[in-house]
């Protein structure tokens, strides 16, 4: 069956790759974006496809539209953007979830929420499993994003339990690949830009904090498997369980770019997680999914 898919945040980094994958499956795509952080260049190559349509709209406002499936990806996802306008960020998370859930309820659509590993905060459990409730500062500089996503998850399950809306919830861990914004403040894009300029690589803290990096094509595969899976609502972790220190990432980027950059150390930001790694046992069991692109290969592809 060729579905009509509504992708909010469809002009963003992950959203644009998702739109592309859906079109490659022969489906129709309504790409909804307010272009706050999304970019038209991300979807320019899709404009000639008759099954692709752009809708300029902000999810904080309701919209009347028909779709079989809704992928809710609308929200600034990097610290630079969500800390610049924290009120807008939490409104997008909460009001956006409410409006998209209301739409899904009205038209009987299946709806998937793009949640985040940030719901775990600075975790005391490692690796993070879906049953872990998290360690989040509700009033810190990151709380507009972290708590906004936690509220959105709650709303999704409330709509499912009370109104029988057919929901899916995924928790996305660090993702990288083509179309990342170079100025979004996320560690992979920061390091690559600095390395290509032979500028100092900025590490916050001592570089011993860890992250897990998933290539965007692997993530999109997991997203589609989750949306297609009947009878499983989540939440489910989607990320690469390979764990690297920030220092290891910096050294790899310098090596692969042939950069002359030196490493500079800066104070660690408040509430920055010290360890972050997904347990993907549930994704393996329920979706038959695990990432296949190793970090070294993905970094090479990102710059190609």
Please describe what each predicted stretch is.
Residues 48, 180-184, 242, 291:
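Residue-level signature of the cytosolic catalytic core of signaling kinases
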């Amino acid at each position: 069956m060729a579905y009509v898919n509504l992708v909010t945040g469809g002009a963003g980094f992950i959203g644009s790759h998702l739109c592309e994958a859906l079109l490659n499956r022969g489906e129709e795509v309504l790409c909804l974006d307010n272009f706050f952080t999304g970019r038209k260049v991300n979807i320019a190559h899709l404009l000639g496809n008759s099954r692709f349509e752009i809708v300029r709209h902000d999810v904080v406002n309701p919209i009347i539209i028909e779709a079989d499936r809704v992928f809710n990806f609308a929200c600034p996802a990097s610290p630079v953007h969500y800390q610049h306008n924290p009120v807008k960020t939490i409104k997008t998370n909460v009001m956006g979830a409410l409006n998209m859930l209301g739409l899904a309820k009205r038209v009987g659509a299946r709806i998937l929420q793009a949640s985040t590993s940030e719901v775990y905060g600075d975790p005391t459990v490692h690796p993070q499993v879906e049953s872990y409730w998290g360690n989040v500062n509700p009033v810190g500089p990151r709380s507009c994003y972290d708590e906004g996503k936690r509220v959105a998850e709650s709303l999704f399950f409330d709509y499912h339990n009370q109104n029988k809306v057919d929901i899916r919830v995924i928790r996305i861990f660090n993702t990288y690949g083509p179309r990342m914004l170079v100025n979004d403040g996320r560690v992979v894009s920061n390091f690559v830009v600095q390395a290509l300029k032979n500028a100092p690589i900025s590490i916050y803290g001592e570089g011993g904090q860890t992250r897990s990096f998933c290539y965007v094509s692997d993530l999109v595969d997991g997203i589609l498997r989750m949306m297609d899976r009947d009878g499983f609502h989540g939440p489910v972790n989607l990320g690469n369980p390979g764990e690297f220190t920030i220092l290891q990432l910096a050294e790899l980027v310098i090596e692969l770019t042939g950069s002359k950059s030196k490493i500079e150390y800066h104070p660690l930001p408040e509430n920055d997680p010290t360890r972050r790694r997904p347990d993907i046992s549930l994704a393996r069991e329920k979706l038959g999914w695990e990432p296949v692109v190793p970090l070294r290969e993905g970094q090479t592809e990102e710059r190609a």
